[in-house]
Amino acid sequence: MDKKMFCYQCEQTVGCTGCTGNAGVCGKKAATAKLQDELTGALIGLARAVDGAETISKSTSQVIIEGLFTTVTNVSFDDAAIENMIQKVRAEKERLVPDCNKCQSPCGKSDEYDMQQLWNADEDIRSLKSLILFGIRGMAAYAYHANVLNYEDAEVNRFFCEALFKIGYEESMETLLPTVLKVGEINLKCMALLDKANTETYGTPEPTAVTLTVEKGPFIVVTGHDLKDLQLLLEQTEGKGINIYTHGEMLPAHAYPLLKKFSHLKGNFGTAWQNQQKEFDHLPAPILYTTNCLMPPKSSYADRVFTTEVVAFPGAVHIDEKKDFTPVIEKALELGGYKEDQTRTGINGGTKVTTGFGHAAILSHADTVVEAVKSGAIRHFFLVAGCDGAKPGRNYYTEFVKQTPSDSIVLTLACGKFRFNDLDLGEIGGLPRLMDMGQCNDAYGAIQVAVALADAFGCSVNELPLSFVLSWYEQKAVCILLTLLHLGIKNIRLGLSLPAFLSPNILNYLVENYGIAPITTPEEDIKALMNH
C-alpha cells in the first residue's frame, strides 16, 4: 500500500476502510502510525527470538505486553516515547539472542517483520491476522493492569509470543481461524486474572451511587482504567484539601471497598472519552491520564494534562514509574477548582449514577433472579455494553435502553454506558432494571453471570432469554468479541458499524457460524431479540 499511513484498527476509521492520509481520525500523525508499525514488527522479531522456548522470562513478557499496549488506539501520540519502546524491544531481543547481529550467515529467524507484508496480504489472510493482532493488543491492556498489581499468568504470556509469531508467518485461513478463537480463549483467562487482581487487592465491588456534582475547591480528574494509579493519587492527596473525581472508565473505582474509604474520592466528572475536549475545555483542574482514551488536548487545557504508564502526548508532563504525583497536586492547588459547587448531569439529565453490580453482587441475588424469571417477572436480559465513540448514530444505544420492556433487565459495562447510565428504569423485585457491572474487562463478570444462569436453568447460554447488544471502538472490544465467539455465543448485535478489517469472506463466516449482525433500529432489534 503506497499510502502516507495505513491504520484501520478502530471503529471510526475513514470510510470504514482505513486511515491513509496525513493523520488518522484518532488524531495520530502518519509518522506515529509508521512507528507503531515498526514497533509491531520489532515485537514480532522478539517473538521469533523466543520461539520454541519452554518458558518466557518476566522481562520479555513485560516488554511484549507494554509494547502491544502502546499501540492501542488513543494511548500514545508521542513519537519519542514509541521510539524508546522500539529500542526497549530490540534491547530485549539482543539480550536473548546476542549473537544474531554478529552472525556471518544470518538465517533470518529472528528478523523484524515488515508490516507492509500484512497490509498488502490477501484480504482474507490480512483480515484474520488483523483480528489476532488487534485482539492481543486489547488483551495486552488487561495483562498490563494485572501485572501492575503483581498478577501474571504464564499461559497468557506464552500466547502473546505464539500469536505474534503467527502474524509474521505464512499461514492459511484454515490454520489462522483456530488462532483467532484462541485469542478469545486466552483473553478469558486474562480477564479472569485481572478480575482476581482487582478484587483481591481492592475488595469485591459493591453497588454504589456516585454523584455527578463537583464540589468547590481544588480537584483532580483521573481518567483511563488503572486502579493502582488512582489508589496512589488518593494516598498522596489525602489531607491536602484536594478532591478526586473519576472520569470515563474510572467510574467503577467508586465501588471497590479499599478505594471507597478515601473520603476525598467524591464523584464522577463528565461522560465518555469522546466528549473530553468539550468537557475539559477551560477546566480549572488537572487531568491525569492513566491509560487510553487520550484525545489531542485543546490549548485551553493542554497545560493541565498529565500522563503516566504507557500514555504519552508531546508536551504533556509525564509521571514516571516512581509515581510522584507532586506536579499534578501542585497544578490542582494552583488552579484552585471551581468557586462554587457545580451541579452537573449525565447525557439524559440525571444527577447521579450507580455502579458496582459486579458478578459477585448480582449472583448474591441469584435465587431472586431465577424465581423472577420462573414467575415471568423477568422476561428478558439485555447486555448493552462496549465502547462509546464520536460517530453520529450512537444515540441508538440510548434509545434501545429506553425502549427495553419493563419486564427486562439491562446489564451494562464499559464506557458505552454513559449513553444511558443516568436513566432511572425502575426495579423488578427489588433489583434495579439497569445494572452497571464495571469496566470493559468486567465482561468477564457478565460471562460468569450468564454461565451461572444457564446452569440454574439447565440450558446453554444461547438458550437463555439473554441478548448481547454491543458497541465497539478499539482493540479491547475486539478481544472481548473473540472471547464471546470462543464461548460459542451467537446472535450478537454489533455496532455502530462493523469492523473495517473484516473481509467479506470472514464476515460471512461469522454471520453463518455465529449469527453476528449489525444493529438496525432499536425498535426492530428489540422485537427480533425478544422473539428469538
Region roles according to the model:
Residues 43-201:
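Electropositive, gly/pro-rich neighborhoods at or near active sites that engage anionic ligands
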